[in-house]
Design a protein with these regions (language model features):
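Acidic catalytic/metal-coordinating carboxylates
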Residues: 41-44, 65-70
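Two-component/phosphorelay signaling modules centered on CheY-like receiver
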Residues: 17-37
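Short amphipathic alpha-helix used as the core "switch/output" element in two-component signaling
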Residues: 47, 69-80
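Active-site beta3 strand of CheY-like receiver
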Residues: 52-58
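Active-site residues of response regulator receiver
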Residues: 60, 87
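C-terminal output/effector regions of signal-responsive regulators
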Residues: 126-129, 135-197
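C-terminal output helix
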Residues: 93, 111-120
Length: 197
C-alpha cells in the first residue's frame, strides 16, 4: 500500500450487485483498507456516508433508488471524501457527469484488483492534495484580510494619532505582543474605536 493509504483509510462500498460488492470489499480489505460500510442502493449510500464519514467511497453509477452520481453530489454537499465511480459504461457524458459531481476516479467494469486499487490510491491522493490546497487558499485569504485590516488601522493611526507609517505599524505590533493578541485583533480594535468617535 502507498504512503497515502498507510493509516488504513476508511472506505464505504456502494454497489447494488452483491457479488461485485463482495469482490470489491475483498479486494480493498486485502489491499489494507478498512471497509466500514456497504450499501446496495444510492439512498443507503448517502445515509451511510453521512453517518460513517469515510475517507473514500467506491460507488456504482447505476443503482436503484438513486444513481451513484446523484448520491455523490448529495454526499459531497455534506462531507469531504474521495469518490471512485464504477460503471459498465465508458460514455464520455457519464465520465463528465461523474467528474462534475466530484468523483476523483472512474473505473469501467469488468475490473480487477490491478485496476481498482491504483484508482482508489490516486483518488485518495488527489483528495488529499485538493484539501491541502483549499487549506492553503483559506490561510492566504485570512492573511490577506489581516493585512488589509492592519493597513486600515495604520492609516487611521497615521491620520488620528499623527504617527508615521512605521510608527503606526510598530505600535500595532507592540500592542499585539504586550496584550498577547493577534495583530488582526489589535487592528480591529483600532478600527472599531475610531469608528465610535
Amino acid at each position: 500500500m502507498s504512503e497515502t493509504t498507510t493509516a488504513a483509510k476508511r472506505v464505504l462500498v456502494a454497489e447494488d450487485e452483491t457479488l461485485i460488492r463482495l469482490d470489491i470489499v475483498e479486494t480493498l480489505t486485502a489491499a489494507g483498507f478498512d471497509v466500514v460500510g456497504e450499501a446496495g442502493d444510492g439512498e443507503e449510500a448517502v445515509s451511510l456516508a453521512l453517518d460513517l464519514e469515510p475517507d473514500l467511497i467506491v460507488m456504482d453509477v447505476k443503482m436503484p433508488k438513486m444513481d451513484g452520481i446523484s448520491a455523490a453530489e448529495e454526499i459531497l454537499k455534506e462531507i469531504s471524501c474521495a469518490i471512485v465511480m464504477l460503471t459498465a459504461f465508458s460514455q464520455a457524458e457519464l465520465v463528465e457527469r461523474a467528474s462534475d459531481a466530484g468523483a476523483m476516479a472512474y473505473v469501467v467494469k469488468p475490473f480487477g484488483p490491478a485496476d481498482l486499487v491504483p484508482a482508489v490510491e490516486i483518488a485518495l491522493s488527489r483528495h488529499t492534495q485538493i484539501e491541502s490546497l483549499e487549506d492553503e487558499i483559506s490561510d492566504l485569504a485570512e492573511r490577506l484580510e489581516t493585512r488589509k485590516r492592519v493597513d486600515r488601522a495604520k492609516g487611521l493611526l497615521m491620520e488620528k494619532a499623527d504617527m508615521s507609517e512605521p510608527e503606526a505599524f510598530r505600535w500595532i505590533q507592540k500592542t499585539s505582543m504586550d496584550r498577547r493578541l493577534s495583530m488582526r485583533e489589535v487592528a480591529d480594535a483600532v478600527i472599531d474605536q475610531v469608528a465610535e468617535q
